Amino acid sequence: MSEKFRLRRTMMFANAQKPSLVKDAYIYKPDSLIIDLEDAVSENQKDSARFSLYHILKTVNFRGVERLVRINALDTPHWQEDIRVCVAGGADGIRLAKCESAQDVIQVEKAVEAAEEEFGMEKGKTLLMAALESPGAVLNAVEICKASPRLFGIALSGGDYRRCMHTRPTISGSDIQAARGYMVMAARAT
């Protein structure tokens, strides 16, 4: 149940390897549930996490909560199989970790299109979201936002961004305020 322009005020992350927690996530009434295949899953557990994800997507009644999946970054050997499982399972959308450029979005879009065709899914059904985690990615935000009609949003991954910037979190969030502001302008301008 996904719409490109639906209201997304709250996004709850859940580990794909913990179906017992994922199945009850609707209780908290998030606008979107992001099932994680990336940071929450250790390297040697990626295959079993995808297996779990597929069964979660196929069997759990999310009661109207949007089902997004955070896939592994493009610099890993996992992202293509992540996409195939997301599409085969019927995920509403995919959150691309460590998106650096419009080309990253286009590469993921092509893989999603191929998977939709392979699994007989409606073309264009699977939406995309880009997580920007570096200063370079933030500076590329306008091009990233224009990269695909499937893209419904961009998000700043604050922890990773801070590591790249060699800064520490502040109570006010002033350390990431400029990046957030630029990303809002980029999203609004496109």
Language model features with spans:
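Expand to "…catalyze enediolate/carbanion chemistry for C-C bond making/breaking, isomerization
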Residues: M1-T190
